[in-house]
């Protein structure tokens, strides 16, 4: 039998569809009956490299190269389906400009900040890194060192980085790019429930009667979940979908109630819904009385800008504990939200009254099971934590939580923003399993697990992502290592903060990346990095599902994984180089040892021999280090959460499964947390138990609407919102190197309302400048297509390295989560 490429693609699609439908697969669609070339493929499972959905894909390898991928029919997440990015996964590793040797800026054979990138060996790279790190340590101590990591790190990479920075170099100046996307979600969970990550799971997609999207374009950003939601909507006539956004996008195609609101007024809409529930007598009084407390939050907390910024000076609560709150009762809460009437909120938000009432009734009706989804529209918000708290309020007031179909659900954007950034604790203030560096008991637990002297881990939280850029610019952060992200393209206010910091002569910047990204080109040293299935690893997705994969192919010669780089670099430092004598005196047996010895080889990380790796499996990192390092890192990390409601299964089990949702207790995963009968950590007889709080009660917060940091005025008369598109992922450093995806969406355009274009004498395709108080960027006008902004707002995606929209954005952050607001700033547009 012969089969051409087109038939093969069609056959895969048939197989996936048949699997979902539960019907038999035609012979032409079976992987077992193919052409002779295709039967040479070796297939294995892996978690997708892109978004936080956590699809499983089958990866086809031939002649040492990934040549095909398709949706994994055994996956409970995607059930054989794949989005367009996942379909082209096989091409992301084979861009023509893949890096294979370290590159150092040099002039006449010596390092020079203004020199040209010159190939050097790995030994030379580590030598200059060690020299620069030691110089910074001797001059200004551990606070002069920093690292910016990623929600794309594997679990093991993130854990290795946390140990190296917080235990080895004794600095908390490590933060992930998840600070830009998930920090507000973390803050919301911790404030309301005292514990992080969603209580629901993707099974809610088949159980809910209604879905509400808050600042989430699932149709493009989470297309596989959108497929499941669409199937539920179209197969069950009673199911309804509401979509709220500041502009119309593809998710509105399915909306029964689509609402365009004025930026920042989602806060007022959320309070109106709470008021409606109370005024119509639909509060679940039994649930509320048994399982919740009420608190009034601090207000007017500023915008996370530099302290000297006029907006920070103006904030009445500037300088106080911005996340503090005081107890109130239900009546006081009801009075607080009573001012958010349908009339006033409609006027403020621009949403018609009947649409607001329809939305509120959906939540209020006790017969309707509601799942709320949100992503960056909520989180990238100067009041992002508040927005998260306020949507929880609605679910708590009605008791619509932690049962099938009733979930407030924060969706993640990166493959392991949950599994690595949040669960491992790669944030500047966190440790694994929701522990924090400020808590002495938590530090003691970490020091015990890591077998460190008491006092090794510093108590002061480190510099968060935005503050890292400011400290680089100010010359206070001098040795800086960036891994697995493209922050020079992703960070807000590039012109004024990010770029000046990278090019500050006082600083030495290292960037680890497979490709010469914008960030890499701003660095002093570039390290070539292995990608995805060129290494063994694990990711954790948005529904608490941890997944693993084996190494399937060799990286290009010279490219090394992020984990290998971190652990190998640790060999360059003896304990005496980085720890004070009084600390070493508490554990004299470490004297003379390297950080590699203390943190990895001689720790519990190093106790799993190479013989535990299956003989037929590649594992370059472990064979370099002499022990099964991925298993060792995972098992040590997992010890933080076992018995503390973050339980993970034994490492080897994950290789046999399509992931497991934690907590995994007695071998069984957990679908819905905080509900007795589903969550093993709930106390018997509790019904619901929000055990993250000492009294088992979740908190309903009274928090007001407050305006955005920057709004349009006479000169800068337009709102700018940024985001993504279906075809590209984040900065496009992978997807723009896939020819098919690049051709489908080659350039980032600015989407405008036709009336705004006409007013400025602009037409579709015109070259224009977007200008803010901080910078400008050129692009072309689009007045048609998938994104339809209202009058007064424009939308521009940020995937295009040739059109850096973050030159114009404002680096305002949520003062609680320190997450950047990329959705709201003021600009003007002029023709070029």
From Swiss-Prot:
Gene Ontology biological process: cellular respiration; Mo-molybdopterin cofactor biosynthetic process; nitrate assimilation
Signal sequence interval, chain numbering: 1-29
InterPro entries, A to Z: Asp_de-COase-like_dom_sf (IPR009010), CT_Nitrate-R-NapA-like (IPR041957), MoPterin_dinucl-bd_dom (IPR006657), Mopterin_OxRdtase (IPR006656), Mopterin_OxRdtase_4Fe-4S_dom (IPR006963), MopterinOxRdtase_cofactor_BS (IPR027467), Periplasm_NO3_reductase_lsu (IPR010051), Prok_molybdopt-oxidoreductase (IPR050123)
EC number annotated for this UniProt entry: 1.9.6.1
Cofactor section: [4Fe-4S] cluster; Mo-bis(molybdopterin guanine dinucleotide)
Location relative to the cell: Periplasm
GO molecular function annotation: 4 iron, 4 sulfur cluster binding; electron transfer activity; iron ion binding; molybdenum ion binding; molybdopterin cofactor binding; nitrate reductase (cytochrome) activity
Binding site for Mo-bis(molybdopterin guanine dinucleotide): 85, 152, 177, 181, 214-221, 245-249, 264-266, 376, 380, 486, 512-513, 535, 562, 722-731, 806, 823
Assembly and oligomerization: Component of the periplasmic nitrate reductase NapAB complex composed of NapA and NapB.
Identification of the protein by name: Periplasmic nitrate reductase
Species in which this protein is naturally found: Colwellia psychrerythraea (strain 34H / ATCC BAA-681)
Gene name, Swiss-Prot/TrEMBL: napA
């Amino acid at each position: 039998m012969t089969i051409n490429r087109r038939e093969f693609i069609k056959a895969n699609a048939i197989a996936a569809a048949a699997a979902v439908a539960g019907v038999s697969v035609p012979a032409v669609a079976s992987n077992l009956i193919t052409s002779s070339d295709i039967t040479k493929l070796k297939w294995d499972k892996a978690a997708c490299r892109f978004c936080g959905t956590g699809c499983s894909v089958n990866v086809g390898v031939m002649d040492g190269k990934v040549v095909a991928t398709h949706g994994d029919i055994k996956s409970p997440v995607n059930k054989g389906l794949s989005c367009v990015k996942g379909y082209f996964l096989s091409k992301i590793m084979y861009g023509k400009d893949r890096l294979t040797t370290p590159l150092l800026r040099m002039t006449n054979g010596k390092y020079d900040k203004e020199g040209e990138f010159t190939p050097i060996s790995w030994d030379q790279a580590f030598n200059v890194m060690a020299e620069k790190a030691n110089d910074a340590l001797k001059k200004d101590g551990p606070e002069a060192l920093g690292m910016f990591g990623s929600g794309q790190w594997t679990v093991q990479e993130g854990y290795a980085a946390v140990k190296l920075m917080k235990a080895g170099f004794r600095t908390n100046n490590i933060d992930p790019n998840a600070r830009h996307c998930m920090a507000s979600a973390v803050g919301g969970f911790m404030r309301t429930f005292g514990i992080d990550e969603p209580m629901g799971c993707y099974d809610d997609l088949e159980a809910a009667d209604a879905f509400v999207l808050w600042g989430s374009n699932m149709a493009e950003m989470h297309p596989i979940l959108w497929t499941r939601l669409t199937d539920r909507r179209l197969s069950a006539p009673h199911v309804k979908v509401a979509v709220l956004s500041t502009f119309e996008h593809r998710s509105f195609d399915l909306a029964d109630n689509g609402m365009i609101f004025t930026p920042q007024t989602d806060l007022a809409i959320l309070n109106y819904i709470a008021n409606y529930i109370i005024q119509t007598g639909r509060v679940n009084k039994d649930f509320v009385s048994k399982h919740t407390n009420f608190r009034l939050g601090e207000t007017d907390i500023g915008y996370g800008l530099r302290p000297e910024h006029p907006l920070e000076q103006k904030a009445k609560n500037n300088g106080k504990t911005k996340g503090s709150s005081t107890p109130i009762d239900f009546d006081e809460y009801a009075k607080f939200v009573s001012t958010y009437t349908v009339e006033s909120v409609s006027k403020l938000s621009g949403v018609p009254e009947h649409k607001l009432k329809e939305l509120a009734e959906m939540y209020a009706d006790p017969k309707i099971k509601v799942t709320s989804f949100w992503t960056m529209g909520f989180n990238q918000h100067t009041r992002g934590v508040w927005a998260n708290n306020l949507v929880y309020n609605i679910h708590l007031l009605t008791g619509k939580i932690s049962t099938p179909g009733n979930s407030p659900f924060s969706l993640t954007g990166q493959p392991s923003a949950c599994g690595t950034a949040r669960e491992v604790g790669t944030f500047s203030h966190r440790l694994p399993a929701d522990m924090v560096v400020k808590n002495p008991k938590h530090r003691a637990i970490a020091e015990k697990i890591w077998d460190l002297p008491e006092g090794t881990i510093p108590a002061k939280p480190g510099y968060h992502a935005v503050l890292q850029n400011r400290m680089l610019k100010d010359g206070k952060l001098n040795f800086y290592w960036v891994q697995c992200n493209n922050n020079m393209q992703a960070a807000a206010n590039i012109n004024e903060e990010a770029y000046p910091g990278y090019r500050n002569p006082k600083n030495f910047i290292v960037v680890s990346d497979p490709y010469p990204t914008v960030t890499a080109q701003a660095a002093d040293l570039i390290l070539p990095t292995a990608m995805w299935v060129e290494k063994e690893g694990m990711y954790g997705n948005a529904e608490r599902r941890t997944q693993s994969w084996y190494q399937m192919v060799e990286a290009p010669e010279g490219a090394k994984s992020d984990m290998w780089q971190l652990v190998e670099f640790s060999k360059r430092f003896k304990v005496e180089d980085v720890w004070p004598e009084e600390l070493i005196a508490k554990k004299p047996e470490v004297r003379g040892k390297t950080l590699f010895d203390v943190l990895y080889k001689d720790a519990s990380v190093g106790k799993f021999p190479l013989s535990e790796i299956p003989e037929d499996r590649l594992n370059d990192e472990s064979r370099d280090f002499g022990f099964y390092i991925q298993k060792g890192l995972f098992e040590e990390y997992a010890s933080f959460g076992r018995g503390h409601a973050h339980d993970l299964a034994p490492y080897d089990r994950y290789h046999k499964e399509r992931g497991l949702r934690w907590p995994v207790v007695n071998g069984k995963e957990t679908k819905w947390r905080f509900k007795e009968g589903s969550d093993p950590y709930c106390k018997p007889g509790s019904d619901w138990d929000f055990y993250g709080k000492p009294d088992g009660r979740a908190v309903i917060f009274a928090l007001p609407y407050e305006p955005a940091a920057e709004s349009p005025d006479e000169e800068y008369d337009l709102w700018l919102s940024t985001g993504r598109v279906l075809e590209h992922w984040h900065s496009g450093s992978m997807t723009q190197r896939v020819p098919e995806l690049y051709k489908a969406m080659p350039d980032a355009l600015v989407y405008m309302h036709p009336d705004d274009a006409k007013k400025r004498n602009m037409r579709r395709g015109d070259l224009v400048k977007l200008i803010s108080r901080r910078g400008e960027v050129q692009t072309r006008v689009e007045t048609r297509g998938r994104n339809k902004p209202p009058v007064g707002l424009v939308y521009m995606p940020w995937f295009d390295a040739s059109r850096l929209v973050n030159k114009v954005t404002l680096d305002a952050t949520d003062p609680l989560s320190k997450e950047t607001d990329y959705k709201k700033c003021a600009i003007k547009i002029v023709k070029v």
